[in-house]
């Protein structure tokens, strides 16, 4: 018989697992990993004060995507073009970024699978006599390792020509030059930290759903068990 077991710790682990998966996915797809040096609407560096140049903007560059100002649009606020600069995997600007894309994609795929499974842990807590929480926690730890590898390799690609075009000639491996780090990079780092927190917290979710109080509720014949 299926028993629906909901505890604070198991629900918190489920919510965190979903949040982490979405955060990493959004960061990976974003173009806001590097914020480029200021440019004018025509794509060149703006002149100094009083130079009469158009209002400057900051282009952004991601692993495979970028955001630039559309030079043909003059009177609309939404004149930024965002999309992939690479039409295929081989066109990603750096070999390091290609490796980053692979590691992040594998890690995110694992996190998404765990997030999906975590929803069903309210009804099914074990499979083949193995705790789903412990298995998911192990998978989250593995995903975290893939994410770390991707994030370590990503700055090594800052010396590629694409990054130099956005960040100036001083850009090199692990030196962003005139660029600053965007919110997507920090989101990916934060998501990686939360991934390991989820991996550790999965053990608490397992303890909460297999406690003596839960067993007492099951023995009383209850199918819906909610415990704080």
UniProtKB/Swiss-Prot annotation:
Tissue-specificity statement: Expressed in all tissues and cell lines examined except brain and peripheral blood leukocytes.
The keyword Transmembrane is assigned to this record: yes
InterPro entries for this protein: LHFPL
Stretches that traverse the bilayer: 11-31, 102-122, 132-152, 181-201
Chief location of this protein within or outside the cell: membrane
Pfam families noted in UniProt: L_HMGIC_fpl
Any GO BP: development of primary female sexual characteristics
GO annotations of cellular component type: membrane; plasma membrane; platelet alpha granule membrane
Keywords per UniProt: Fertilization, Membrane, Transmembrane, Transmembrane helix
The family this protein is said to belong to: Belongs to the LHFP family.
Protein name: LHFPL tetraspan subfamily member 2 protein
Source species: Homo sapiens (Human)
Lineage of origin: Eukaryota, Metazoa, Chordata, Craniata, Vertebrata
Underlying gene: LHFPL2
